[in-house]
Amino acid sequence: MDFRLLNEKSQIFVHAEPYAVSDYVNQYVGTHSIRLPKGGRPAGRLHHRIFGGLDLCRISYGGSVRVISPGLETCYHLQIILKGHCLWRDHGQEHYFAPGELLLLNPDDQADLTYSEDCEKFIVKLPSVVLDRACSENNWHKPREGIRFAARHNLQQLDGFINLLGLVCDEAEHTKSMPRVQEHYAGIIASKLLEMLGSNVSREIFSKGNPSFERVVQFIEENLKRNISLERLAELAMMSPRSLYNLFEKHAGTTPKNYIRNRKLESIRACLNDPSANVRSITEIALDYGFLHLGRFAENYRSAFGELPSDTLRQCKKEVA
């Protein structure tokens, strides 16, 4: 499959030692370990971009490398086979993924993958909060246990999806999009996956025409840097605090407190990824959004996005340089 998904502008490694590629992937894309073949000298290649909270990665190890991951914790992996094949093993199951097929890993899925010598993949890392937000914005119901997808899919299930990824890659490499624009693209990708691939999400529209929920969400968006009390939200929704909890559980799949915290974290991440935001320090932006305990803020951020806020800011400055 010959698709232009990230070009030399996003090149991190070429003809590189596989362990160097693996170390970089561990930092930005997903925790794993690799096992190399006994013979030969594989030469890895890697392209990488961060865009709208997503990590976009094109990778080849250049040899028959085995990749083992204990799980992604707070992120999903969409892995599209571009060249060669990849053997996937899971609880007694085996499948050789070929070009045109894709593997979707849930946060708690362990992975045991063996690349062919000519295997090349395009990987999209989606933080769970991006999919959660897509559920909320589309008025779909997220299960209490979290969103889960089936593992094996074909690109034919996602009509036009590869072209969408090409557009996103082009946007990431050639323009300095505003954070809101980047979030919009990320939301389209998440919505497309939820709509077209098998998952446990109910797409029955729950909150259509629910002015109370829409009014509360709008208030939260307009006051992310302020201390938002549950009492004020209940007053806006014209209901009791207990009914407010039920409202958020029904329409957002989480509590009001978690929803507010996640939106604050997403807004901070957008600023850290925006070169024009001129972020002077992590401490300053955390305090701006009401996170007074910096250690807890960093841990919440890492749980949501799989990296520390300092990692996000460092990567943004690296791309600008």
From Swiss-Prot:
It comes from Pseudomonas putida. It holds the Pfam family HTH_18. Residues 214-315 form the HTH araC/xylS-type domain. PANTHER family: ARAC SUBFAMILY (PTHR46796:SF6), HTH-TYPE TRANSCRIPTIONAL ACTIVATOR RHAS-RELATED (PTHR46796). GO terms for molecular function: DNA-binding transcription factor activity; sequence-specific DNA binding. Keywords: Activator, Aromatic hydrocarbons catabolism, Cytoplasm, DNA-binding, Plasmid, Transcription, Transcription regulation. Residues 231-252, 282-305 bind DNA. Its main location: cytoplasm. This is XylDLEGF operon transcriptional activator 1. SUPFAM superfamilies: Homeodomain-like, Regulatory protein AraC. Regulatory protein of the TOL plasmid xyl operons. XylS activates the xylXYZLTEGFJQKIH operon required for the degradation of toluene, m-xylene and p-xylene. InterPro entries: AraC-bd_2 (IPR035418), AraC_XylS_family_regulators (IPR050204), Homeodomain-like_sf (IPR009057), HTH-like (IPR037923), HTH_AraC (IPR018060), HTH_AraC-typ_CS (IPR018062). PROSITE patterns: HTH_ARAC_FAMILY_1, HTH_ARAC_FAMILY_2. It is found in: Cytoplasm. SMART domains: HTH_ARAC.
